[in-house]
A protein has these predicted regions:
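Sec-dependent N-terminal signal peptides
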Residues: 3-12
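Catalytic glycan-binding domains that act on GlcNAc-containing polysaccharides
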Residues: 14-156
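Generic N-terminal initiation segments characterized by hydrophobic and/or small/turn-forming residues
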Residues: 1-4, 34
Length: 156
């Protein structure tokens, strides 16, 4: 019986993961945000769990705070499509606001754009922010490398 439940849970998790991946790719393409970056943010924020809730009150796959969700017209933060759409739209908005600087984008995503833009590039004031930016950057590079290998592009 245990093995059966494990298979059922694994199947549900795989289906959930596939759904998250499909919406991540769809909205990344729609908003012109790199797929690899969106997947890195999702992995760090929630591990792809649509039911994730943080101690600060962020919820869903991309861990949207209530105010951010409201600004991007999210009705249900636990709805995968709506959450990913809003999260990617927010990343696109941050990209434009931060002049394309991924470090500032990621620092703004975790700490809030007003706080980060006020401090400029000195987001090392917080070990949480620094660790977050470092982790997303690592996963982004890993995801990018995997994409290049999958596409058969030679790397140097």
């Amino acid at each position: 019986m245990k093995w059966f439940l494990s298979l059922v849970v694994a199947g549900v998790c795989s289906a959930q993961s596939a759904e998250v991946g499909r919406w991540a790719d769809h909205w990344a393409d729609a908003y012109g945000v790199e797929r690899e970056l969106v997947h890195a943010v999702i992995e760090v924020e929630s591990g792809g769990n649509p039911r994730a809730i943080s101690n600060a009150g962020a919820a869903g796959v991309m861990q949207l705070m209530p105010d951010t969700a409201a600004a991007f017209r999210v009705r249900n933060r636990f709805d995968v499509e709506d959450n990913v759409r809003a999260g990617v739209a927010y990343l696109a908005w941050l990209r434009d606001l931060c002049g394309g600087d991924r470090r500032l984008m990621m620092a703004s995503y975790i700490a809030g754009q007003n706080r980060v833009l006020r401090l400029g590039l000195d987001f090392t004031y917080s070990s949480e922010v620094h660790d977050y930016v470092t982790r997303v950057a690592y996963l982004y590079r890993r995801n990018r490398w995997e994409t290049l290998l999958r596409e058969g592009v030679e790397t140097r």
